[in-house]
Amino acid sequence: KQCSDFQSKWRMITYFHGEHTGVCHGIALSMCYGNQGYIDFDDITSGAHDYWTLGSPYENSKMKDMILYYQMTQCLDSGRSTYGISKNSGWGNGDLETFLKKFVAEAQYAKRVKKPFVFSFMIPEGGHSGVACGYKKDTDGNHEITIYDENSYHPGSYGGYLTMKVSSDFKSFHF
């Protein structure tokens, strides 16, 4: 069976880093780039006009290559986070309030210009990426950010929307 260069590279990454950890980042990033017009869906699947009409990556090698390509970009210096925070050392490399202010500001901007963005997190067992695609302020002044989880972090789960609620004082958040 023939394989693409991207599939070969992905197998190498899997070999060097242990078991395959998924492609959520590649899916989320390709969804955002597609939404912003950087990907011509018709080049991937003839007649496709949006992400949902591309079909299954299991049956479409061009779509699978696209997802794997964007998945691998997180390994590049240019593909790293624009900002982040770590809870490991008491929110270590930045305080939670500053992080949440930046995150809410980015969600507000994304809503205004209609350009969703990738939201990623890491936990000791791995990490996950989704698409931050909505924002509103509730009646108490708290911030609600809608995140599309394209395949969910938990095994056997399906895609869906969840809401990240950030307190009005930016000192806490919950889902």
Cite the ranges covered by each PLM segment.
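Cysteine-nucleophile protease catalytic domains, especially the papain-like/related folds used
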Residues: 1-98
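Active-site-adjacent substructure of cysteine-protease-like catalytic cores
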Residues: 89-148
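Cys-His-centered catalytic/binding microenvironment captured across papain-like cysteine peptidases
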Residues: 124-126, 136-175
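Histidine (H) residue identity feature
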Residues: 17-20, 25, 49, 128, ...
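Phenylalanine-focused residue identity feature
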Residues: 6, 16, 41, 99, ...
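Generic structural signal for short, solvent-exposed loop/turn connectors between secondary structure elements
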Residues: 12-17, 21, 34-40, 122-130, ...
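Context-gated lysine
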Residues: 1, 9, 62-64, 87, ...
